[in-house]
Regions:
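Anion-binding and metal-coordination hotspots
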Residues: 1-189
Length: 189
């Protein structure tokens, strides 16, 4: 099929306006092809830098005065680049298939992206039980609190070196573990 570049840009604007509906449709349609395992969901956030001189200016609506934040903003870059960045967060299911994503200006806190994207994603699921898995940078108290309600839980990595002595001892303790199948104690070997 032949189509104009301008047509694809117009389509992108239309798609952006219905992004959440489209993601829900993709989830449901793919679930009919391959059973999606959303019992464990992994989230991570990264950023992309642009080799430009200045960040984008925010857009101010002349009629309403509403300010829309531009995407390419100065923020903390994982590549340590002194360039404007855009942040992207991605949820994947237990098989590594993407579930949802968010794109935010580079100067936004990535932890806010996690909870807002998860709330949207949960609305798409029939089975609301899930375990949120992320690295330590995405395990704030607010995120852990959010994932302690309902039938949600969380696993967030933590540096063993930064733990208190009693917790370090507990981590390396080989006793006190129980099998889920029959609740019998089983030492780690």
């Amino acid at each position: 099929p032949h189509y104009l570049y301008e047509s694809s840009l117009r389509f992108m604007s239309l798609l952006a306006g219905h992004f959440d509906d489209y993601i829900t449709h993709l989830y449901e349609a793919s679930n009919s092809i391959i059973r999606r395992d959303t019992s464990v969901c992994y989230f991570d956030c990264t950023n992309y830098y642009f080799e430009i001189e200045t960040a984008d200016d925010d857009y101010v609506d002349e009629v309403t005065g509403e300010v829309s934040s531009a995407l390419r903003k100065y923020g903390i870059s994982k590549q340590h680049q002194p360039s404007p960045i855009v942040q992207m967060g991605l949820f994947i299911d237990a098989q590594g298939i993407p579930l949802s994503m968010c794109i935010n200006p580079g100067n936004h806190n990535e932890q806010l992206c996690a909870t807002s994207t998860e709330k949207k994603m949960i609305r798409s699921f029939r089975d609301k039980r899930l375990i949120y898995c992320a690295d330590a940078g995405l395990g704030s108290m607010d995120i852990r609190r959010f994932n302690s309600f309902g039938s949600r839980a969380f696993i967030v990595t933590q540096s063993i070196k930064k733990l208190s002595n009693p917790l370090q001892k507990a981590v390396f303790n080989h006793d006190g573990y129980r099998l889920l199948s029959n609740n019998m104690q089983k030492p780690l070997t």
